[in-house]
């Protein structure tokens, strides 16, 4: 069994809008995650950020992991940015099918054909990568179409089509705060992601029943990912990225990590009041 040292850090993200001191509650989450990962054969990267307060944690937060189908969040965001700029609409048709339908298939059912149709329409992998870089998203690489990704020999440590956990959470943060797409487009995107049909045994599995989750999974041989938003009981949203490669029982590991994150951030709400950050309306 290959052992991977786990580097834990509890700091504000470089790109986060606020700098928040680490609380003892999140330190305990680090310890729980450290114990959890020590018992796992998979290599796991985690990042989580309270979008209201800026409190954050990460495990291997700066290590690239293959995105698999979680790249579809970036494809959707670029298309919606083009909608916001008047270049496209969700009612446009491509190959006889509306973009709205293609978006649903791509994000809800992780349909690879629909993803590649939208990939091509926004300009391909290079266009998505360039858009992320131009908007200050560092740590994400987009190199291949989904068809190319599936056809190529798979290497769990290939840095093509990869993201660090922190970079993925930064993408989610900026989507949520309306920095990459409009509030209207953000609400549409989160509404579709809330219907995600894949990965029911991952991020959502061990959360309390009824917990709102908007997420996108990624799966390849030896890879299991889940990224998105978890809404806490008081309405705070936590942006979460969990990547797992190699080893066994990766979905269960993702579910356990998500529950530890949920419980840890929930304890923060007993602390003195922290005002919510203003988000785009």
Residue ranges of model-derived segments:
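Soluble periplasmic/extracytoplasmic beta-strand elements of cell-envelope proteins
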Residues: 45-50, 58, 74, 107, ...
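Conserved catalytic neighborhood of penicillin-recognizing serine enzymes
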Residues: 88-128, 156, 161
């Amino acid at each position: 069994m290959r052992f991977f040292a786990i580097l834990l850090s509890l700091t504000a993200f470089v790109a986060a809008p606020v700098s928040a001191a680490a609380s003892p509650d999140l330190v305990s989450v680090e310890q729980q995650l450290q114990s959890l990962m020590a018992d796992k054969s998979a290599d796991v990267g985690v990042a989580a950020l309270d979008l209201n307060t800026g409190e954050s944690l990460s495990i291997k937060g700066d290590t690239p992991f293959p995105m698999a189908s979680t790249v579809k969040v970036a494809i959707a965001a670029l298309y919606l940015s083009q909608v916001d700029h008047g270049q496209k609409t969700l009612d446009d048709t491509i190959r006889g099918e509306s973009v709205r339908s293609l978006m649903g298939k791509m994000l809800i059912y992780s349909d690879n054909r629909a993803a590649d149709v939208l990939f091509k329409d926004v300009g391909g992998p290079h266009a998505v990568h360039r858009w992320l870089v131009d908007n200050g998203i560092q740590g994400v690489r987009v190199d291949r179409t989904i068809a190319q990704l599936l056809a190529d020999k798979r290497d769990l440590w290939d840095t093509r089509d990869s993201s660090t956990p922190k970079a993925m959470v930064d993408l989610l943060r900026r989507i949520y705060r309306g920095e990459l797409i409009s509030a209207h487009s953000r609400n549409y995107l989160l509404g579709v992601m809330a219907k995600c049909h894949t990965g029911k045994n991952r991020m959502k599995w061990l959360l309390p029943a009824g917990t709102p989750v908007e997420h996108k999974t990624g799966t390849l041989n030896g890879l299991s990912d889940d990224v998105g938003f978890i809404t806490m009981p008081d309405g705070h949203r936590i942006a979460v990225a969990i990547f797992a490669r190699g080893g066994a029982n990766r979905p269960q590991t993702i579910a356990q990590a998500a529950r530890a994150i949920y419980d840890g951030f929930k304890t923060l709400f007993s602390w003195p009041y922290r005002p919510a950050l203003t988000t785009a309306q």
